[in-house]
Amino acid sequence: MMDLSQRRLRDLALRWFDPVDLPGNFRICTDTTDFFRVDYNDVLILNNHPYLVRGNAKEGRFGIDDEPKYWVKRSTDLLDGSKKVIKLVFNERFQARVGPITFNCIRSPMKEARVLSVVKGHPNFMQGFSVADDSRNVVRIIDYIYGENLPTFISGIKKDHEEYFHGSFPSILRAYIETVKAIHFLHENEETHGDVRRDHIIVDETTTRFRWIDFDFIFYHHENRFGYDICGLGNILIYLVGGGDVIAQRLRDERPDVFQRLTREDMNIIFLNRVANLKKVFPYISDTLNSVLLHFAMGTETFYDDTGQFLDDLLKAKSSLQET
């Protein structure tokens, strides 16, 4: 068994950190049940492997950039210096709605551990593994992905929409299609992502691939267990085609002629202030691509049953971009 004495831990930590950044003695944690007690400069020992905690991860959704996620620890592997994201057990339940449909949701560490095994080696997913702590909590140890999340990446493209759509969007669509194929791979393996949203895609700065993170949610619905993932994919596509959210209130103020042509049926089925029928706003969007978006509009009468159908239409839309 590895020597994990205080002296040995300090020697390991000094390979990666300045002495002034380290405590005189480390507090060692082998039971993560109370994740609030796992704090900065604690050493997590999991499966006889030491990780130095460097802080809590933060929630970046909807601009909440400093909302800590106390069950997710930014850490360093003391044996090789690599950055890790260590996810501790946090249980919660809630309901979500997509139009008239209600989904029941739970957060499941076991499910995420299972999915990590399924996607091992897949370039469009975060990579990691699970271990049990001394109280048999399922802890997930994730390789840190260097890059920015998808909203940050898109907001960094400083072009007007037409220039963005014809210049940047074709390559973005290609990368996005790879993420849809990745979700299709999950579904073929009878798994779901469970929390498909744009800030759960990281643009890997090394490979430029779009990579999925955070798949510890399970959504239940008696008709289609994959439906929530598909709705999330549609919301991301609408966001990418628009080069950001196209908000009705903003159109009312800035483009009143366009706003007056919009109806309730043109709006996003989940976010009722966002336009899904983007061809009414940007007429150069192809009919083929816009027809995909309309599957996620309030006026739709047909939903995608599976990611295979969605992929087929996306590939046709990609071809329509090349033709124009």
Label every model-predicted segment.
Residues 2-63:
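Juxta-kinase regulatory segment immediately upstream of eukaryotic protein kinase catalytic domains
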Residues 175-176:
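Activation segment signature within eukaryotic-like protein kinase domains
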Residues 183-198, 203:
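Catalytic-loop of the protein kinase fold
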